[in-house]
Amino acid sequence: MNLVLNEEETMIKDAANDFLVENAGPDHLRNLRDDPDSKGFSESLWGQMIDLGWPSLLVPEEFGGLDFSHIGMGQIMQQVGCHLATSPLLITGILGVTLLKSSSSNHWKAKILPLIAQGKTKMAIAIDETSRHDPQVIQTKLTPKAGEYVLNGTKLNVVDGQVADSFIVIAKIPGEKPKEPDDICFVIVGSNQKGISVKNNLLIDSRKTSSLIFSDVKVTDKQILKFNESSESILQKLLSTANIYLSAELLGIAEKAFELTMQYLKTRSQFGVKIGSFQALQHRAANLWAEIELGKSIVLKALRSLDEIDKDINKIASMAKAKTSKIAENATNEGIQMHGGIGMTDEFYIGFYLKRAKVSQMLFGDWKYHLDRAAYLSGY
C-alpha cells in the first residue's frame, strides 16, 4: 500500500490549507462562539466551501459530483482540524454521501445526492441514544400502523441536527416473520415533519449538537433506505468511515497544537534564555513529533483502506481513532503544559485546540471504546 500522497492529493491539501488560513482559525471560531445567533458554524464559510466544490467531492459523477478519493477528502479534513473550521462537511458531504452511495434506493440517491453536490441541503444522522457512544443501544422503534409506520424514540448528540433539512434515523423495525428478532433500519425523515422536536446543545468547542424526540412520526415504506447487505454491516461501515475522517481531523489538531507550542518555546524566555533550550522540554517535543509522524502514516493507511474497500476496515478505523485520539490529547495537553498558565487564557490559541480535540475524540466513540472494538475484531 502506497502511503505517499500523489500530485492531485497534495494539491487539494495545499489548496485547503491556503483557503482555511484566510477564512477559518481560532479568531474566527472565537467570533462564532461569541455570536448569540450562531448555528454552530459559519454559513459564510460553508458557502465558500460549496463554491470550492468540497461537498461534491465524494458524490458520483452521474449525480453531479467529482467522485474523488477518500484520501483526497481526508486531506481536507486534516486541514479542517488544523484550522478549527466548523461546517456540515463531515456529516452531509462525507457520511450522508457515503450512506446514500451504498444504498440501493435509487429514488433517494437521485433526489438527495445532486442537492448535496450543489450545497443545497444539509443532513444529520441520528444514531446515539446514550450520553456516550454505544450503537448497540437502539430503542427508537419503527412500528407498522395502518399500512404505514410510526417512528418513536429519542436520539442524543446529533451533529448538525440544529440545521438539518432531513434526518437519517437508525431505528429498530420488527422482523419480517413472526418471532424473528427486530432488525435495524435507516429511515429518512424531513426535519419539518410533524412529531419531531429538536433541542440544541452547546459543546465546549463552540459547536452544537441536538437531542431529537420522535413522537408518532408518520413514515412510509419509501422512506426506509434499502441496502444489498445487512443494515448492521452498513452501520458499522458508516461508523468506521466517520472515525477515519475524525482521525484525520484529530491529526490536524495535533499538528497545529504542536506547531503553536514550538513557536512558543522559541519565543518565551526564562532565566535569560529561550525555554526551548531546556533539554527536558526538547525531549517532550521530540516525543510529540515522533507520535505525530506515526499518526500521519496511520491516517493515510486508514484512508487508503476506505478507497480500496479493505475487508478489515472496521478494525483499521478503530485502531486509527484510538491512536489519533491519544496523539491529539497528548499534543494539546503538552501544549497547555509548555505554555504554562497563559495557555489557559482566551488570548492564546492552544486552548481552542484542546477543546476541539476533546469533542472530536468523543464523537462516535472515544479511544477506550475503539481499543475494545479493535481488540474484539482481532479475536480477543
What are the language-model segments listed below?
Residues 137-143, 157, 190-226:
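Flexible, small-/acidic-enriched active-site or ligand-binding loops
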Residues 112-114, 130-131, 139-141, 155-159, ...:
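A generic local secondary-structure boundary/capping motif
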Residues 134-152:
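Cytochrome P450 C-terminal beta-domain/meander region
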Residues 96, 119-121, 136-138, 163-165, ...:
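A generic structural signal for well-ordered coil/turn residues at beta-strand boundaries
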Residues 85-107:
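N-terminal glycine-rich flavin-associated loop
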Residues 1-84, 103-107, 115, 119, ...:
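Alpha-helical interface subdomain recognition
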Residues 152-196:
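A short core secondary-structure module
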